[in-house]
Amino acid sequence: HRQRMPLKRRTVMRKIEKRAVICMALAILLAAGMSVFLIRYFAEGGKWASSAFNRHLYDSDGVLISGTVLDRDGDVLSSVENGHRAYYENETVRKATLHAVGDLYGKIGTGVLNAFADKLTGFDLVNGAFGAERGSNLYLTLDARYNYEAYRALGGHAGTVAVYNYKTGEILCMVSAPSYDPLNVPKNLEENDRYKGAYLNRFLSSAFVPGSVFKTVTLTAALENLPDAETRTWNCTGSVQIGDETITCSGVHGEQTLKEAFAHSCNAAFAQIAEELGADTLRRYTEKAGLTSAYSVDGLPTAKGTFNWDSITAGQLGWAGVGQYHDQVNPCAFLLWMGG
């Protein structure tokens, strides 16, 4: 006869089996949790370590006191001196490089003091933020001299100036205005219209009506879609009526070739060209130029351009073809188009 296991022993075995299943489930959950943690640690460890709550890296006011920012020539744009964040000695250079370097309190999100705090701290996955006693040096592709001259050239006007090496992609100049001195912040900065948008990097995060530089897109479309584009002429009397819109021009250019119309930046000619090309063609070439795309500058996203091509009238299309109407283009996107 087959021997039967005593009831008490069977009960004990069932309990052991249940406990084994529970332990296995807990082990799987632990392994899954550790996997998620490790994935996030590798992806976001730098952000965790460079948090403003880390008093090893920030002072009591939340100012990063680790790392040095330098321009391409090794000129120090910002460093830590005696436990305090310091900036370049020249006030105009400080204003000209503010949106690239960043302010003391992280108001300018695209500044390297905020966006690349993990790199400035010397963080690495093995040693954390304690791998470098005084943080790391972060070299920018910018040249402080170019920024200085560009900021002065703006003459107090709001706007942005940027220069890049189209062969290497290095940004040599990136100025945004209005700006201010990070070591002497105006007390009424957030209420004063003079400083409206001072925290915004207009090169990366804004979009503007492009104006006549958009004619380069219209010109490209004309050369590739109008068979006689280089031999025919367009007449300019100072304005042209297209649909229900009067497209005005800066002068009276008379009969002119495409080359001459481009040299004159003639609104009348390019509005006629835009109407002939049609909205679908201009939309295609605008997208092909990348003017509706967002780009990444070392991980910093740019604003997207916007164009309203739907239900556009002939007159509105004429204005769009010369860079007016509702066209909005990000400066970085246009810089890439011109350098491409």
Residue ranges of predicted features:
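Periplasmic/cell-envelope proteins involved in peptidoglycan metabolism and beta-lactam response
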Residues: R4-L189, A198, A207, D280-K288
